[in-house]
From Swiss-Prot:
One Pfam entry name: Herpes_gp350_C
Biotechnology remark: Primary surface antigen capable of inducing and reacting with virus-neutralizing antibodies. Almost all EBV candidate vaccines are based on gp350 proteins.
Protein's UniProt name: Envelope glycoprotein GP350
Originating species: Epstein-Barr virus (strain GD1)
The protein's assembly and partners: Interacts with host CR2.
Recorded family membership: Belongs to the Epstein-Barr GP350 family.
Residues linked to a glycan: 47, 87, 114, 166, 169, 195, 229, 277, 318, 328, 345, 356, 378, 386, 411, 435, 443, 457, 497, 519, 533, 554, 568, 582, 585, 603, 614, 650, 684, 695, 704, 729, 764, 807
Entry keywords, A to Z: Glycoprotein, Host membrane, Host-virus interaction, Late protein, Membrane, Transmembrane, Transmembrane helix, Virion
Length: 856
């Protein structure tokens, strides 16, 4: 034994005292073994040596329990027994109790070693040594000495069963050697008039555990909880056993035929698993003082053992957060409580949290005489003159990393430190990003250059050309956006899929572009970005078409609005090289909490003269640029959202170059779907931009995703109706989506056939919002001129239909029809007058009502 203990680096010693009668097993609790925190692969190899005295001769039994995995298994049996009898492995159990504590259990009425005849009565248990080698290779030992020799008396235990004991349907459950059960019972007297005593007995599989009240009885039962301690035969656990008696009946109301109701909770320990699941708990109790027979009443309950993993085995841990600048960080590990300047045996270990390789991740171990071991990467350490241990880490990167550090002194006192190293952000070189709603897809702001930090709320001079303007507002951040991005001035030379986008011809039909400085008090101050070929739907595979308008919101106007397009936002791929652009429209009124109206992006890769960029709105209305090559993102839409299920859209909104006070009135009727009025309004298939008009041109979907019946490769352009109330509605593939796809329409898809490069009107199944008079702002579109007040056409007529007759012929037909109708009316009136004069008196012989009447 002494030789074996020499290999132990740390040893814990204890004295075992067995009390009462032998219950049929010995139980030794072994505390303070190191199970490291935040480590699922931290195992331990455990071996146990049992030291016997047989007639003055020493005998040793070695048990190999193998590897302990505290996160997956709680009960272990020896894999082998050296120096024992044939069935020795069946006589021992090792159980995890939680908090780094083990329990070794051995049957006491069967001999685990081979002895000669006549020596059976001379076998005594002297001591137990437990060897626990952790994942760092450190050997921890526990030496448990018996206070008095404990003799093993092999005998057969008779089967015991108590009669006249009331059975219950309640099962007593044992977890980590602790039994817990609550039983209902009754006493003949009320609480303050009663005393109480109890005794328990657990029987099964040649095990007999008895537990009694330490003070014998509760002399006076009080209302509420009456707590008491109990003592069980065998090993006395360091966790006390006890019980609680609670009165559950009103003080003056007995239960007829049974008396007064009580609740009894019992928690005896240790309860060995050798009892088995067929064992029985007997409870003997009395309400009139202790009885020699054990009590006046008896109830019984079945016992089952749970395989549930007990409470965490991990050592207690102190947590420290360290934020550092640069490449290295240092943490000083102080001495443990019982350590002094002369302690000869000090060990420090360190590993990164949640390791996965026991061969390579546990190399960092230091002693007073050793340096940094080989294989300890990114971690170095050394003892200082004051016995503190300084650990330096390096090369951690930007993500926080957690280091687990332990320090152990000579008497096996151990402290554990959890240190979280976080690198301080370098605000001058990176643009921080954050997901404010939890809906934005990853890489939402990857278009930002990593080495560029752009201040927010920048406004370009009016003469600088295309500029994305921002404004501070109090609207909440819309869902699916990324905050923290900064606006920058776009580059004038964008590229899209390798196709260079030319600057717009200012002499073309595209309106002149101006960039006025935002006016904080103007109700409709806006900034218009130049739109190349803004109104001509070009659907060639390599011909970029994009239209972007970014009006500046007015923080003080109740009708201010912001339309922030999002070119180059990506979704499900629609076309290989067909340039498309989606627009994300936000209402950012100064005091409005209106949800954002978002047009779902569908893999648009449009080239714009203002630069390939993706504008994402945040709580500070900051915007950021994105390059033409970008990973896919997903736009999540809140309420009041119109989604375009397939294809990308080029949406052009023309805003005034100068200050205007004209807005769409919320009381104006919304145009019907498919309206083809040549005057103005949505549904106009003309390529000219009219007041109040929003032209939407579909891109080129692969295999004509917009029209499933069209032949492969066909290009289809479908204008989409947009209401003046601010909702963009689209019917694509026969489905109309509003919000999160809550509404659908069974409108069939029209197959135009042929080369449908000319935009045609599709009749949409559209539901518009009613006019709102509430103070909550709704999204609105701005016009280049006052809104048209003439009546809109209410009958959908295809724009290409031609009249069959001339206007003069139609006029003649109308007058002729009117004359014929008038003549017929006169003839009818004359006939009625003639018949009235010829009428005579009549009497109904069969009255149509209950009483007979004469009608003239």
């Amino acid at each position: 034994m002494e030789a074996a203990l020499l290999v132990c680096q740390y040893t814990i010693q204890s004295l075992i005292h067995l009390t009462g009668e032998d219950p049929g097993f010995f139980n030794v609790e072994i505390p303070e073994f190191p199970f490291y925190p935040t480590c699922n692969v931290c195992t331990a190899d455990v071996n146990v040596t049992i030291n016997f005295d047989v007639g003055g001769k020493k005998h040793q039994l070695d048990l190999d329990f193998g590897q302990l995995t505290p996160h997956t298994k709680a009960v272990y049996q020896p894999r082998g027994a050296f120096g024992g009898s044939e069935n020795a492995t069946n006589l021992f159990l090792l159980e995890l109790l939680g908090a780094g504590e083990l329990a070794l259990t051995m049957r006491s009425k069967k001999l685990p070693i081979n002895v000669t005849t006549g020596e059976e009565q001379q076998v005594s248990l002297e001591s137990v040594d437990v060897y626990f080698q952790d994942v760092f290779g450190t050997m921890w030992c526990h030496h448990a000495e018996m206070q008095n020799p404990v003799y093993l008396i092999p005998e057969t235990v008779p089967y015991i069963k108590w009669d006249n004991c009331n059975s219950t349907n309640i099962t007593a459950v044992v977890r980590a050697q602790g039994l817990d059960v609550t039983l209902p019972l009754s006493l003949p007297t009320s609480a303050q008039d009663s005393n109480f005593s109890v005794k328990t007995q657990m029987l099964g599989n040649e095990i007999d555990i008895e537990c009694i009240m330490e003070d014998g009885e509760i002399s006076q039962v009080l209302p509420g909880d009456n707590k008491f301690n109990i003592t069980c035969s065998g090993y006395e656990s360091h966790v006390p056993s006890g019980g609680i008696l609670t009165s559950t009946s009103p003080v003056v109301t007995p239960i007829p035929g049974t008396g007064y109701a009580y609740s009894l909770r019992l928690t005896p320990r240790p309860v060995s698993r050798f009892l088995g699941n067929n064992s029985i708990l007997y409870v003997f109790y009395s309400g009139n003082g202790p009885k020699a027979s054990g009590g006046d009443y008896c109830i019984q309950s079945n016992i089952v053992f749970s395989d549930e993993i007990p409470a965490s085995q991990d050592m207690p841990t102190n947590t420290t957060d360290i934020t550092y600048v640069g490449d290295n960080a240092t943490y000083s590990v102080p001495m443990v409580t019982s350590e002094d300047a002369n302690s000869p045996n000090v060990t420090v270990t360190a590993f990164w949290a949640w390791p996965n390789n026991t061969e390579t991740d546990f190399k960092c171990k230091w002693t007073l005489t050793s340096g940094t071991p080989s294989g300890c990467e990114n971690i170095s350490g050394a003892f200082a003159s004051n016995r503190t241990f300084d650990i330096t880490v390096s090369g951690l990167g930007t993500a926080p990393k957690t280091l687990i550090i332990t320090r152990t002194a000579t008497n096996a006192t151990t402290t554990t430190h959890k240190v979280i190293f976080s690198k301080a952000p370098e605000s001058t070189t990176t643009s921080p990003t954050s997901n404010t709603t939890g809906f934005a897809a990853p890489n939402t702001t990857t278009g930002l250059p990593s080495s560029t930090h752009v201040p927010t709320n920048l406004t370009a001079p009016a003469s600088t050309g295309p500029t994305v303007s921002t404004a501070d507002v109090t609207s909440p951040t819309p869902a699916g956006t990324t905050s923290g991005a900064s606006p920058v001035t776009p580059s004038p030379s964008p590229r899209d899929n390798g196709t260079e986008s030319k600057a717009p011809d200012m002499t073309s039909p595209t309106p002149a572009v101006t960039t006025p400085t935002p006016n904080a008090t103007s109700p409709t101050s806006a900034v218009t970005t130049p739109t190349p070929n803004a109104t001509s739907p070009t659907l060639g595979k390599t011909s970029p078409t994009s239209a972007v308008t970014t009006p500046t919101p007015n923080a003080t106007s109740p009708t201010s609005a912001v339309t922030t397009p999002t070119p180059n936002a990506t979704g499900p791929t629609v076309g290989e090289t067909s340039p498309q652009a989606n627009t994300t429209n936000h209402t950012l009124g100064g005091t409005s909490s209106t949800p954002v109206v978002t047009s779902q992006p569908k893999n648009a890769t449009s080239a714009v003269t203002t630069g390939q960029h993706n504008i994402t709105s945040s709580s500070t209305s900051s915007m950021s640029l994105r390059p033409s090559s970008i990973s896919e993102t997903t736009s999540h839409m809140p309420l009041l959202t119109s989604a375009h299920p397939t294809g990308g859209e080029n949406i052009t909104q023309v805003t005034p170059a100068s200050t205007s006070t004209h807005h769409v009135s919320t009381s104006s009727p919304a145009p019907r779907p498919g309206t083809t009025s040549q005057a103005s309004g949505p549904g106009n298939s003309s390529t000219s931009t009219k007041p109040g008009e929003v032209n939407v041109t579909k891109g080129t979907p692969p295999k004509n995703a917009t029209s499933p019946q069209a032949p492969s490769g066909q290009k289809t352009a479908v204008p989409t109706v947009t209401s003046t109330g601010g909702k963009a509605n689209s019917t694509t593939g026969g489905k109309h989506t509003t919000g999160h796809g809550a509404r659908t329409s069974t409108e069939p898809t029209t197959d135009y056939g042929g080369d449908s490069t000319t935009p045609r009107t599709r009749y949409n199944a559209t539901t518009y919002l009613p006019p709102s008079t509430s103070s909550e702002l709704r999204p609105r579109w701005t016009f280049t001129s006052p809104p048209v007040t003439t009546a809109q056409a209410t009958v959908p007529v295809p724009p290409t239909s031609q009249p069959r007759f001339s206007n003069l012929s139609m006029l003649v037909l109308q007058w002729a029809s009117l004359a014929v109708l008038t003549l017929l009316l006169l003839l009818v009136m004359a006939d009625c007058a003639f018949r009235r004069n010829l009428s005579t008196s009549h009497t109904y012989t069969t009255p149509p009502y209950d009483d007979a009447e004469t009608y003239v």
